[in-house]
């Protein structure tokens, strides 16, 4: 009887763990990672790194790859929310970040800077799909 109880407990813990892993992260969490990674006036990031006198292309490539992953995650969340246009915008940002990572890996600064112009089109989506929340942050606009 005791063995059966232990087996049931282990199965319950495993099921809970699999369920939590499958849920993924929410959009707010993803966006809060994208902002500082891309960069803001308060928190310099990838776009400022590209403008440095001697850009660290290895770090830029790694950051752009991370940005690509985050936008792919955001695309999935927008798809779950049935927001096709926002999902398309996130997909375009993901592809642009991937192109930026690829160019940065070559070490060619001019090509890397040229690829930067396709990334960071955040305002188009934010202007249409986000609104302030009562806590001073932002939330997805009701569709």
Segments the model singles out, each with a brief description of its role:
Residues 1-8:
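Bacterial N-terminal signal peptides that target proteins for export
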Residues 8-17:
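Bacterial N-terminal signal peptides
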